[in-house]
């Protein structure tokens, strides 16, 4: 704990007696959708199928290609394609679609995902992280994207763990990039709800958030202060010109709060 931030670390010894040796286990069928280079020098992003039956794997491969191309079309990934590999893993489910508790619909799927996380209809996650990693056995993997075979809007991004998003909703492309920003980059949400301030306790206004793209101005110098033009006021007023030009500034509203977070 440095006073400004805290970090937790846990050392894993590969020789630990309680770690099962799975080097002889066969890897699931998989395909490189984008190969930037050698696995030892690249970040390997594995894309898993969730809620796709064996007969729907071809559809999954098409969806995974869409996700890969969309992510790599945005900076900073666009300029660093040679540092990433994207690998689609054919992980079939017994049932098609995913579990929807609010409809009392429970399905047997590869990682057991479900909507209604934290009782939010759109929040789609899975607590079966062990299942995800079992599916990647003997496949290079530093990060996970899970595509859900449903047209219902939803998803979630868990920092340093996985992105999970629905593949057949019209907003699939922007949502998979958004959730990847959470899971891979640790970015906070840059939006808020007009009706109410949700999750008021999620961010203390007396401290600087750990997410790199939101601030309470407590320690803004540690964030993107060096990217703001000296002629731009802080906080920054929203204008049509700034919106059109994507002017870097400090705009109020973020982390689900309309006031106090920028």
Q: What feature does the model see in each segment?
A:
Residues 57-60, 155-179:
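Short pre-active-site segment immediately N-terminal to the catalytic Zn-binding motif
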């Amino acid at each position: 704990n440095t006073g400004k931030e805290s970090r937790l670390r846990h050392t894993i010894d590969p020789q630990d007696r309680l770690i099962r040796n799975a080097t002889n286990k066969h890897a699931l069928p998989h395909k490189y959708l984008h190969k930037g280079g050698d696995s030892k020098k690249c970040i390997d992003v594995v894309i898993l199928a969730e809620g796709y039956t064996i007969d729907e794997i071809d559809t999954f491969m098409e969806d995974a290609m869409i996700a890969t191309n969309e992510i790599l079309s945005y900076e900073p990934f666009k300029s660093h394609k040679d540092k990433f590999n994207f690998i689609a893993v054919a992980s079939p489910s017994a049932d098609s679609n995913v579990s929807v508790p609010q409809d009392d619909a429970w399905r047997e799927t590869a990682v057991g995902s479900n909507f209604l996380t934290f009782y939010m209809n759109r929040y789609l996650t899975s607590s079966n992280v062990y299942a995800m990693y079992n599916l990647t056995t003997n496949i290079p993997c530093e990060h996970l994207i899970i595509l859900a075979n449903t047209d219902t809007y939803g998803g979630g991004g868990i920092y340093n763990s996985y992105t999970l998003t629905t593949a057949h909703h019209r907003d699939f492309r922007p949502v998979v990039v958004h959730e990847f920003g959470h899971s891979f980059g640790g970015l906070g949400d840059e939006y808020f709800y007009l009706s109410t301030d949700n999750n008021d306790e999620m961010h203390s206004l007396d401290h600087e958030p750990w997410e790199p793209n939101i601030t309470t101005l407590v320690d803004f110098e540690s964030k993107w202060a060096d990217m703001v033009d000296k002629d731009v006021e802080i906080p920054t007023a929203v204008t049509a010109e700034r919106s059109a030009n994507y002017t870097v500034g400090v705009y109020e509203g973020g982390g689900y709060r309309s006031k106090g977070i920028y």
